[in-house]
């Protein structure tokens, strides 16, 4: 019985250490993920802002061409 307890204790210690290792790894991955998400949002925001003015002009041009072809 004592031998079984010792074996289970050692397994438990191993599991606890492995759990700590995985928790640290998950924390690092989460930080990397948050950083990548932040960078992606910045890039999307920049491209949206820079293409937003061009897209507005394109929409106006499309509306004009649609209007002229519909009335023509």
UniProtKB/Swiss-Prot annotation:
InterPro entries for the chain: ZPR
Induction: Up-regulated in response to increased HD-ZIPIII activity. Up-regulated by REV.
Coiled-coil intervals, chain numbering: 14-44
Alphabetized UniProt keyword annotations: Coiled coil, Transcription, Transcription regulation
Keyword Transcription (UniProt): yes
Comp. bias intervals (Low complexity): 49-72
Region Disordered, residue ranges: 42-72
Disruption phenotype: Zpr3 and zpr4 double mutants exhibit homeotic transformation and ectopic meristem activity.
Function: Competitive inhibitor of the HD-ZIPIII transcription factors in shoot apical meristem (SAM) development. Acts by forming non-functional heterodimers. Part of a negative feedback loop. Essential for proper functioning of stem cells in the SAM.
Subunit architecture: Interacts with REV.
Protein name: Protein LITTLE ZIPPER 4
Protein species of origin: Arabidopsis thaliana (Mouse-ear cress)
